[in-house]
Amino acid sequence: EMQRSLVGSEMCIRDRYRSGDGRNHSQSGYEYLKNEAHISDDEILNCVRYHHGMYLKNASLAEDDKAYVVYYADNVAAFSDRREAEAGEGGFDKAMPLESVFNILNGNHGQSHYAMQVLNPKNEINYPTEDEISMDEHFYQSVIQNITDNLKGITLDEEYINSLLAVLEANLTYIPSSTSKKELADISLYDHMKMTAAVASCVMQFLTAKGEKNYKQSLFINAEKSYDEEMFLLYSMDISGIQSFIYTIGEKGALKGLRARSFYLEIMMEHIVDELLEKLSLSRANLIYTGGGHCYLLLANTDDTRDILAVSYTHLRAHETTLHL
């Protein structure tokens, strides 16, 4: 339920603002979801309208409104992806493209950025370039239209959360989460939204386990104290025995065999992750990374989570072959 509210709440609110709508993105996003996406769920609408403190403090909301959870999660996600640039200046630039994360890696000072695109398997890989690029309102408007069209076939419930995530990934991967001139713009809007959803779902599970129902008190009034609480677990899995599994094949049809076994490993890890997330009542928003026989998940630091992880691990170990988890 939390992820349904959160993913729906963050939906393209910044795109709406950057497409030429001059209002603040909280109000703009609220009206978009209500009037154009025809979302009538007050829980989702409140999460959009009041996800910034300046609006939340004057809102007449119940103490257990999930807008407080979204506000808190948005701040936590922003702490990790909003970093000031060395020569940053004030103001915002709505035409700012997404920068490459490799610009500052290992002490680099690159100027590469990505072309404005949506994900499309027919397109060539969108490699970063130093050619002059700027986002335009037409692109943002087309992204909003894409998302609006896709929403018509999606029900905002737990069965469609992963589908909604896929829609957002396709449209928001090359859009920066922040266009502040004083900050680095190398985190996509999709990644910020996804991380906000992951954090929010963990916070909800953590507070529920504690029996805490006054979200206003714990996450808004006493937010600074809550930031020090150990609410999260970073959980990783690794498949060992990959090399011997992949390369113990005969010469005949070797290339096809390598591809088949590599694909098998990828699908196996994806299946394990999906099964685990379902048991934990989470979505793929909580999957930080998967690939090469590894994965990382953001989970709630609760006894229930630890118990589920222990049981799942025991079951998986009981069915091991030459591959070990």
Where are these regions (language model features)?
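Phosphate/oxyanion-binding active-site loops and adjacent basic polyanion-contact surfaces
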Residues: 22-25, 188-196, 258-269, 309
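Extended charged low-complexity segments that act as oligomerization/scaffolding linkers
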Residues: 34, 38, 42-61, 67, ...
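Divalent metal-dependent catalytic cores for phosphoryl transfer on phosphate-bearing substrates
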Residues: 1, 5-125, 175-179, 227, ...
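Surface-exposed, low-hydrophobicity interaction/linker segments
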Residues: 252-280
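Extended, charge-enriched "interface" segments that sit outside catalytic cores
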Residues: 123-177
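Residue-level detector of conserved catalytic or cofactor/ligand-binding positions
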Residues: 2, 6-7, 13-15, 311, ...
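Alpha-helical phosphate/pyrophosphate-handling elements in metalloenzyme active cores
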Residues: 1, 28-39, 190-219
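Catalytic-site or vestigial catalytic-site microsegments of nucleotide-handling domains
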Residues: 235-244
